[in-house]
Amino acid sequence: MSETKPKYNYVNNKELLQAIIDWKTELANNKDPNKVVRQNDTIGLAIMLIAEGLSKRFNFSGYTQSWKQEMIADGIEASIKGLHNFDETKYKNPHAYITQACFNAFVQRIKKERKEVAKKYSYFVHNVYDSRDDDMVALVDETFIQDIYDKMTHYEESTYRTPGAEKKSVVDDSPSLDFLYEAND
């Protein structure tokens, strides 16, 4: 008979939930406002493993290692800051909560990094590169400059909202049963 291998989960959700419950109980019992109740190592290790695992997801595979390290750091920070909001009486899946906090932090980091890259490109195009200087034109490849222009305009277009982009109220054009309520003459 074939024996199934146990599935390896890098974070045990039940142990993590129990650690969070213990930490929040200790936090609630803390009477001294100057005393900081630290999260234990189980929670910290789980947050680090979840952030590291999420960085390997296909959504984030194309980013450089430096961006990924920044994303992981932001994810860990967001998870630690927001873990006190986790309602252990209502939800039993802290892994999903931490993953969502990390995911949102990753997306915010990507937006921030893209904005910084757009600033660098804009500075280069407007202050460094001079198309009227023959020496500069000879040094710089035209496809490189065109690529920078394309990336810069793509970012600028993504930040502007078109006037018709606001959410409109949905008008229900589906057939109604109002004709049943009309009074017969």
Swiss-Prot record:
UniProt keyword Nucleotidyltransferase, yes or no: yes
Record note on what altering residue 97 to A does: 65% loss of transcription capacity
UniProt KW Membrane keyword: no
UniProt entry keywords in alphabetical sequence: DNA-binding, Host-virus interaction, Nucleotidyltransferase, Sigma factor, Transcription, Transcription regulation, Transferase, Viral transcription
Superkingdom, taxonomy of origin: Viruses
Classification via InterPro entries: T4_sigma-like_factor
DNA-binding region, residues: 114
Cysteine pairings via disulfide bonds: none
Effect the entry attributes to changing residue 77 to A: Loss of interaction with host RNAP core
Region Interaction with host RNAP core and recognition of the promoter specific element: start-end pairs: 13-113
GO biological process: late viral transcription
Residues under site feature: Interaction with host RNAP: 70, 74, 77
Listed GO MF terms: DNA binding; nucleotidyltransferase activity; sigma factor activity
Annotated stretches, region: Chaperons the template-strand ssDNA of the transcription bubble: 114-153
Effect of residue 74 to A: Loss of interaction with host RNAP core
Protein family according to the UniProt entry: Belongs to the Tevenvirinae RNA polymerase sigma-like factor family.
Self-association state and partner proteins as the record states: Interacts with the host RNA polymerase catalytic core formed by RpoA, RpoB, RpoC and RpoZ to form the RNAP-gp55 holoenzyme. Part of the transcription activation complex containing host RNAP, the viral RNA polymerase sigma-like factor, the late transcription coactivator, and the sliding clamp. Interacts with the terminase large subunit; this interaction may load the terminase onto DNA for packaging.
Function per UniProt: Plays a role in the transcription of the viral late genes by acting as a late promoter recognition subunit. Associates with host RNA polymerase (RNAP) core and thus replaces the host sigma-70/rpoD subunit in the complex. May also play a role in DNA packaging by interacting with the terminase subunit gp17.
Full protein name: RNA polymerase sigma-like factor
Origin species: Enterobacteria phage T4
Lineage: Viruses, Duplodnaviria, Heunggongvirae, Uroviricota, Caudoviricetes
GN (gene name): 55
